[in-house]
Swiss-Prot record:
It comes from Aquifex aeolicus (strain VF5). It comes from the Bacteria. This is Uncharacterized MscS family protein aq_812. One of its GO terms (biological process) is transmembrane transport. Pfam families: MS_channel_1st, MS_channel_2nd, MS_channel_3rd. It is found in: Cell membrane. The keyword Transmembrane applies. The keyword Calcium does not apply. It is a multi-pass membrane protein. Keywords: Cell membrane, Membrane, Transmembrane, Transmembrane helix. GO terms for cellular component: plasma membrane. SUPFAM superfamilies: Mechanosensitive channel protein MscS (YggB), C-terminal domain (SSF82689), Mechanosensitive channel protein MscS (YggB), transmembrane region (SSF82861), Sm-like ribonucleoproteins (SSF50182). Belongs to the MscS (TC 1.A.23) family.
Length: 368
């Protein structure tokens, strides 16, 4: 009995102690608030895990994996939100004015939301790169992906920052006006950069050139080595690397040799003036037959073989046809084979190629 009385007296002392106040706050409220904080700190990961498990089961049923990225991006921020919410409840228990507790909750909720969105953008970056790899190559895709990621992140930071300022009663109208003027100044200073970036995106979508193609832009001709966000690199035939701003490619005529399905060949041959009419007619006829039968000559294009004019030292024959290839080496092989056969035709018909010559006639020999 005495032991029970002793325990009751201890309990009375304990209950009396709970009525005590610390900084004007009842001790029992401090204990409850501390318990809430401890509970959320211990169970935040468990709660987040259970919610993520439920959401994951739902996302598996969908065809896209974007929702899986969203869950993956938001799981860690959500666990921190649980702690913030527990702290918010603790503030209410401690009788902190609700207006300040609400501001605390909204402030950290915005920060956590912004963090979660940026985490999602980092994960989604690979998707952006994969999309642009299909149309512009790996290097270009990574550059475009990084650029888009930075723009989106900056947008998120601006929106979250503006929302926080507005939540704390800061007039963002004046700030936006100042930012607008600053943005105008920056945009004017970076006009060329933005123009090149926009042109890079146009090149990506319109595809006037691709890596590996042989092109001519302005006075530069060569193979495209790289298409960047701001410039395109062309390796000329003398192995010089030329960097051309993307806006110059968009604003100028681009001749793409790789996309030609055939190449035109046009030249003149000159035979000597001693060539008889019958010989010349036979030469023209046999060259036409050669071009008609040659496998390297495009059959869907007209060819021309005509005695066109009288030169200073030769009878000039125009020869024009289309080589049925866009490969440069194959193109040269076709030209070489046809040229050798033309040489045989001229020699077979008893004529020869003329070369510039001048005859000097002396009417009277000078007296010695």
């Amino acid at each position: 009995m005495e032991e029970i009385l002793i325990w009751i007296k201890k309990l009375e002392k304990y209950l009396y102690a709970l009525n005590a106040k610390v900084a004007g706050i009842p001790l029992y409220k401090i204990i409850i608030a501390s318990a809430i904080m401890l509970f959320t700190l211990i169970l935040r990961r468990l709660i987040a895990f259970l919610i993520v498990k439920i959401l994951t089961k739902l996302t598996i049923r969908t065809k896209t994996d974007v929702d899986e990225l969203i869950v993956k991006a938001f799981v860690k921020p959500f666990s921190y939100f649980i702690v913030v919410f527990g702290f918010y409840l603790s503030l209410l228990v401690l009788e902190v004015p609700k207006v300040y507790a609400d501001k605390f909750l909204k402030t950290f909720s915005l920060l956590i939301l912004g963090w979660a969105i940026i985490r999602f953008l980092n994960l989604f970056h690979n998707k952006i790169v994969e999309f642009f790899v299909k149309v512009g190559g790996k290097d270009f895709a990574e550059e475009v992906g990084d650029f888009i990621l930075k723009i989106l992140k900056a947008f998120v930071v601006v929106i979250v920052g503006a929302s926080l300022l507005q939540e704390w009663g800061v007039n963002i109208g004046a700030i936006l006006a100042s930012v607008g003027l600053l943005g105008l100044a920056v945009s004017l200073a970076a006009k060329d950069t933005f123009e090149n970036i926009l042109s890079g995106l146009i090149i990506l979508l319109d595809k006037p050139v691709k890596v590996g193609e042989t092109v001519k832009v302005k006075d530069f001709m060569g193979s495209v080595e790289d298409i960047g966000l701001r410039s395109t690199k062309i390796r000329t035939f003398d192995k010089s690397l030329v960097t051309i701003p993307n806006r110059d490619i968009v604003n100028n005529h681009v001749e793409n040799f790789t996309r030609r399905n055939k190449r035109r060949v046009r030249f003149y041959i000159g035979v000597v003036y001693s060539t008889k009419r019958e010989q010349l007619e036979n030469i023209l006829k046999e060259i036409r037959e050669l071009l008609k039968e040659h496998p390297g000559v495009a059959k869907d294009e007209k060819f021309y073989v005509y005695f066109e004019n009288y030169g200073d030292s030769s009878l000039n024959i125009l020869i024009q046809y289309y080589a049925n290839t866009n490969d440069y080496e194959e193109y040269l092989k076709i030209i070489e084979d046809i040229n050798l056969k033309i040489m045989e035709i001229v020699e077979k018909n008893g004529s020869s190629f003329a070369f510039p010559s001048r005859s000097v006639y002396i009417e009277k020999m000078p007296k010695s």
